[in-house]
Amino acid sequence: MSEGNIKLLKKVGLKITEPRLTILALMQNHKNEHFSAEDVYKIFLEQGCEIGLATVYRVLNQFDEAHIVIRHNFEGNKSVFELAPTEHHDHIICEDCGKVFEFTDNIIEQRQREISEKYGIKLKTHNVYLYGKCSDINHCDENNSK
């Protein structure tokens, strides 16, 4: 049990439970990945960990409300979660295999600031999702077979 995770859960007002600690550890061990509740459930099922799907949904929703994870609705409004990043990034999503690539681009960031200033809006946050198809069909085949 990670002492840091216990402190984090206490800090955001969540009770320390085995499912919360287990799900948090999974998210931390896969910082650049995006998981649906079903993905998390299947991983635990394969590991022989007895955490129910309803519990996974509930914990991920609690983590989202506590800003431990961020919820995205990439694929047809299906929620996926990633550990709350320390630095801003945007996403490119393949419509065929669902692979998510993270990127940062200073030109895009600057242009968004210019546009918000033009309209007199003080920009707080934003999300950029770019959708397309993998240029390497083998990449999609590999992801779809998993």
UniProtKB/Swiss-Prot annotation:
Changing F44L: In strain: F3031. GO terms for molecular function: DNA-binding transcription factor activity; transcription cis-regulatory region binding; zinc ion binding. InterPro entries: FUR, Fur_C, WH-like_DNA-bd_sf, WH_DNA-bd_sf. Residues 86-146 are annotated as: Dimerization. Pfam families: FUR (PF01475). Fe cation binds at H88, D90, E109, H126. Residues 1-85 are annotated as: DNA-binding. It is found in: Cytoplasm. GO terms for cellular component: cytosol. Zn(2+) binds at H34, E82, H91, C94, C97, E102. Its main location: cytoplasm. SUPFAM superfamilies: Winged helix' DNA-binding domain. Belongs to the Fur family. Homodimer. This is Ferric uptake regulation protein. The lineage of its organism: Bacteria, Pseudomonadati, Pseudomonadota, Gammaproteobacteria, Pasteurellales.
